[in-house]
Regions:
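Alpha/beta catalytic cores of group-transfer enzymes, especially the acyltransferase/condensing modules
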Residues: 142-187, 362-365
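Beta-strand segments within the central parallel beta-sheet cores of soluble alpha/beta enzyme folds
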Residues: 55-56, 105-112, 143-154, 327-328, ...
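DPxDG-like acidic metal-binding loop motif
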Residues: 36-39, 121-141, 374
Length: 412
């Protein structure tokens, strides 16, 4: 059933999001840069006169998976087993905890989504934030974008029990390209550079991400412990460090300042700490482009190297900013691959194929070890070329996307 043929007295839609810059940094308290994409999840709703919710996913129904749920306005138990209804229950639970239960009314909701599940494009966040906006609209809750993001985060993190950061929910709620500060009060900076076109490539590889974050966090903790217990480390440096991955003031630590002391730890721990510092520096550089700040050759070479500068120098003037952002993406992909061990041969084939037909840059989007690749391209036609090239090397599916809008009320 196509979205255009479906009806509801209230219709809400929420976007998927791609993990654009500073991947794997939100849980360290560092800023991240998500981008909303054109693929959207639609909620077709009919308000009820009671306090009962019914939810139905046409996509899961089509796959023969559990696709319906019914529950009331109260603190609902999670059914577990990755049941999709738990995300809806989680949103209601958070609102009840916030004292808004008395304002809620029942709704019949049917969901139809363009966002593939498990592809690293935040289908769960689109569901949480979209449902929160539906309740906000129907029940007159007067919730702002940040409220919707925080409710979605609490639903997934605290109610469903997924150890996620806030990247996905904020990216879905605000839309566009944003810089999200990942320490309280979680400031959001909408970035003005929106003339970007992406090819989003689903590798088709489904890898459990449950052990990806804890293993790398453990590596960082091991390295930090070695630094904190070393008598060689200056006290001034230790003041900016800590014993766990989320304690250091990473933005105040320069690689030059710390690199001479990294010999006190094992190679994996060293790689994880270098990754953190280099990824942040790369993102700070890219943010200048996204804010339309002027940068010169010297700064480009310092951040990206001479070889990448040569690629940028050869590009037409009107494409130069896009080329710089593409080279930043390539650089960040290399960091994810070489210092965070998150790539696979099949993912490398997809990245190479996209660059081979003219993408400006390509990188892992999401946790890694599968999921999606995001490639920056000149236009929609070039995006289709990239998708065809990636499909020819084994990718499952692809979409061309401009920068999308955040969660919104379509009608009702």
């Amino acid at each position: 059933m196509e979205v255009q043929s479906m009806k509801g007295s209230v219709v809400i839609s929420s976007p998927g999001r791609a993990d654009f810059l500073n991947t794997h940094q939100d849980y360290k308290g560092l800023p991240v840069v998500p981008v909303a994409i054109n693929l959207r999840m639609h909620f077709f709703a009919e308000p009820r006169k009671d306090k009962v919710f019914t939810v139905r996913s046409l996509d899961l129904e089509g796959l023969g998976e559990p696709s319906a749920d019914m529950f009331e306005v109260k603190r609902n138990k999670m059914r577990g087993g990755k049941f999709f209804g738990d995300y809806f229950r989680g949103v209601v639970n958070v609102l009840v905890k916030r004292g808004l239960g008395r304002k809620l009314r029942g709704i019949d909701v049917t969901i139809k989504s363009e966002i593939p599940v498990g592809s690293g494009l935040s289908s769960s966040a689109a569901l949480e934030v979209g449902f929160a906006q539906l309740l906000n609209h129907v029940c007159n809750l007067s919730l702002a974008k940040q409220d919707l993001a925080e409710i979605g985060f609490a639903a997934e993190n605290q109610e469903v029990g997924v150890p996620c950061g806030r990247l996905d929910q904020y990216g879905v709620s605000y839309g566009g390209i944003i810089k999200l500060e990942c320490r309280p009060p979680y400031r959001v900076e909408p970035l003005p550079f929106r003339d970007l076109t992406f090819a989003i490539i689903d590798s088709g590889i489904r890898h459990s991400t449950a052990d990806i974050h804890p293993k790398r966090q453990s590596d960082i903790n091991r390295g930090l412990k070695a630094l904190m217990e070393s008598k060689e480390i200056p006290e001034a440096l230790k003041e900016n460090l800590g014993y766990t991955f989320d304690q250091p003031r990473w933005q105040e630590i320069g690689e030059e300042e710390i690199k001479h002391f990294l010999s006190v730890m094992d190679d994996k721990a060293k790689q994880r700490i270098l990754f953190t510092l280099r990824m942040q520096k790369s993102t700070e550089f890219a943010l200048k482009i996204l804010r339309f700040e002027r940068i010169g050759k010297e700064e480009i070479v310092m951040n990206l190297g001479q070889d990448r500068w040569e690629n940028i120098r050869k590009s037409p003037q009107e494409e130069r900013d896009h080329r710089i952002l593409g080279e930043v993406m390539n650089d960040q992909h290399c960091l994810l691959r070489d210092l965070y061990d998150l790539s696979l041969p099949d993912l490398e084939d997809i990245c190479s194929a996209s660059l081979g037909v003219g993408a400006y840059g390509a990188k892992i989007s999401g946790a890694g070890m599968g999921g999606s690749i995001i490639a920056l391209v000149k236009n929609e036609e070039k995006g289709r070329d990239v998708i065809d090239a990636c499909l020819s090397v084994g990718a499952k599916e692809g979409w061309v996307s401009k920068v999308g809008e955040g969660v919104r009320v379509e009608s009702g």
